[in-house]
Design a protein with these regions (language model features):
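Membrane-anchoring hydrophobic helices of lipid-metabolizing enzymes
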Residues: 2-77, 84, 191-193, 219-231
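Catalytic core of membrane glycerolipid acyltransferases/transacylases, capturing the structured
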Residues: 60-118
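Acidic, metal-coordinating catalytic cores used for nucleic-acid/nucleotide bond scission
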Residues: 95, 117-120, 144-151
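Generic beta-sheet signal
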Residues: 114, 140, 168-171
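Catalytic-site beta-strand/loop segments enriched in glycine and acidic/polar residues
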Residues: 126-158, 162
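A cross-family acyltransferase "interaction/gating" segment
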Residues: 150-209
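C-terminal functional extensions of proteins
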Residues: 201-204, 208-229
Length: 231
């Protein structure tokens, strides 16, 4: 008897495959989360707080800006040095972003989906609401696809609409591995020293022409690059 176009007995359907992949992905995220916690405990930290906000009461909220290739242990850095601060992270709406969003939520942060390079009106509105509620926002302004160290316009739009200052931040490592990704993503080696650099907050000015907007974009990009030692 012909089975026609129906599924053969014992075969896995596409829907079942997606469920299996989803369970595997969640298991990998949970395992990676625990591994990252153990890994981070071997690291030594040094703080360079030029903004004077570490350990201080929360009096102002910020748009935290960090280059994408420094992202790996950043949630742990926030937990360690800013336990009193809460907020949301902008994560790519891609499938790869699904796993990162799950991991970020495990660190206790809310997630807004969207691209920092092409931030849509919905994402800007959601992030503005987070800032208006007194919480912080974290963005990697060259993510999710680069070019590396090139600041996308989304963070400028957000800072102008919300009025919140941008806080450039950076992580430098004494010893690390570099991946072959578009931004040469950085993995600190176990027992490395991590320097946490925090710049003075920067307010983005309102702009009326493309030239003025580009000047603000370059000024913020330069402020972030001033913290970078290892490219």
């Amino acid at each position: 008897m012909s089975l026609g176009t129906g599924e053969r007995r014992g075969e896995t359907t596409p829907k079942e495959k997606l469920k299996i992949e989803g369970r595997l992905a969640r298991w990998l995220v949970a395992f990676g989360f625990r591994l990252l916690q153990l890994w981070a405990r071997t690291l030594r930290y040094e703080i360079d707080d030029r903004a004077g906000i570490v350990g201080k009461p929360v009096t102002e909220n910020y748009v935290g800006a960090l280059w994408h290739n420094r992202l790996l242990i950043f949630p742990l850095v926030l937990q360690r040095f800013f336990p009193q601060r809460h907020g949301a992270a902008l994560i790519s709406a891609s499938r790869d972003g699904d796993l990162l969003a799950d991991a970020v939520q495990r660190f206790g942060y809310d997630v807004i989906r969207g691209s920092s390079s092409r931030m849509g009106a919905t994402a800007i509105l959601q992030l503005t609401q987070v800032l208006a509620s007194g919480r912080d926002v974290v963005i990697t302004p060259d993510g999710p696809r680069g070019p590396a160290y090139e600041l996308g316009p989304g963070i400028i739009f957000l800072a102008q609409k919300s009025g919140a200052p941008v806080l450039p931040m950076n992580l430098e490592y004494s010893r690390c591995w570099r991946l072959g990704s578009w931004d040469r993503f950085i993995l600190p080696r176990p027992f490395a020293k991590v320097r946490v650099l925090i710049s003075q907050p920067r307010y983005v000015k309102p702009t009326g022409t493309p030239e003025e907007f580009e000047a603000e974009r370059l000024a913020l990009q330069d402020a972030m690059m001033a913290l970078v030692e290892m490219r």
